[in-house]
Amino acid sequence: LNNPDNKKEAPATVITTPYSFIIPCLTGIYGAMTTSDALPSQPFPDAARDAVYQAIFSRRDVRSQFLPKTIPDDVLGRLLLAAHHAPSVGFMQPWNFLLIRSVETKARIQTLFRKANEEARTQFKDERKDLYSRLKLEGILDAPINLCITCDRERTGQTVLGRTHMKEMDLYSTVCAVQNLWLAARAEGIGVGWVSIFHPHELKAALGIPENIVPIAYLCLGYVSEFLDRPELEKAGWLSRLPLEDLVFHDTWGQTGGEHDPLADTYQALRQQYGYA
């Protein structure tokens, strides 16, 4: 009765992408989705775009502000999924994610850190050494979850598309996973602290990591009391952020824009908008 002329109706559009979990999010940004094999190519609306930059500019390496608040499983799952969707050379996805909740395991890891940190302290001199001694460089026991992200350099065999001439690309890919997780965590109000002062072989032994697996990042994750307005090392006087224009070269190494830099006005506008550039 609803189709008296017995005409064939056009089939409803069905999203069939394996990444269909993205669709509800993008639908909220762009409106109705009308394709099953592509995502919109236009820029995000201003609010969504600004949220991405807000996560980037307000991301911090957290050491001292962790709260004893549990990260819900659904939030943790989103962070891991964001990490898993990092770009990777040859799509080899070389990462694994080792979650550490055990207080005993954390204590063993902190012991390794303290040993290495004292070794590191002796490598600095005079005022630098004194300042280093005052810095808190880990939140291993303070953070509810520790996470070791690793790289399996043999995951897809010895010959990897895109790694034939730059053998370190799988390591860099894993670092992209770290950054994805870090930015997603900031959007969720979760702090991340990267602890890198270990002897890698000792860390591997403590966590039972196989010989062929490379630990890339040991991260402390948790809700925080606050995010600092500037990086902690900058606030402590360790180093300052470098001017962007000193780091951008044109056409050949070392060639800055100088007085006629086409991006000069852009740098100034960025400083006014974000406080620094």
Where are the predicted features?
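C-terminal helix-cap and adjacent tail motif
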Residues: 34-44, 48, 55, 62, ...
